[in-house]
Amino acid sequence: MSTMIQTLYKPVEPNTFNIAKDIKLLICDVDGVFSDGLIYMGNNGEELKTFHTRDGYGVKSLLNAGIEVAVITGRQSNIVENRMHALGISLVYQGQDDKLQAYQDICDKLKISPKHTGYIGDDLIDWPVMEKVALKVCVADGHPLLVQRANYVTKTLGGHGAVREVCDLILQSRNELEVHQGLSI
């Protein structure tokens, strides 16, 4: 059995740590990953979601380190567009029933191979992309099948800093955790 590597959040397998070191593109789902998965609906049809500022800080830190960040979500929402724009994420794919096609498009645009990509998901719709990437991440409260199949399961719940945890893992694996700081937003 290999010796685990201690990260800020939990011990990880050396192989997972090495995979994280080679990530050039992190793709995230939104509902259940960036948000807690709850959708608040008002009487007039308005929709509200919450996003954790820690996740924003982590994303900005990755971008400052030259690591691309993209979003693929099954739903369509102006809230998501505005939040991702505020974070500096330009590759935002919404309303995607076929997340694999969106993933291929992102990789083609950026000319990044699957061995340099990671994906954070929480439900079965995310698996087709997750099985293609090197760093397969499921949030702590994700679907049990994804938890079983992921090579990293966050300690943190979706919408409560899970994205930040993965950003920190990637930066720590590169010895750049304290070098690239984002702005909390």
What are these language model-derived features?
Residues 3-5, 10, 46-49, 94-95:
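Short, flexible loop segments at the rims of nucleotide/cofactor-binding pockets, characterized by
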Residues 22-39, 130, 163:
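Asp-based phosphoryl-transfer active-site loop
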Residues 30, 74-75, 96, 140-143:
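Short secondary-structure boundary segments
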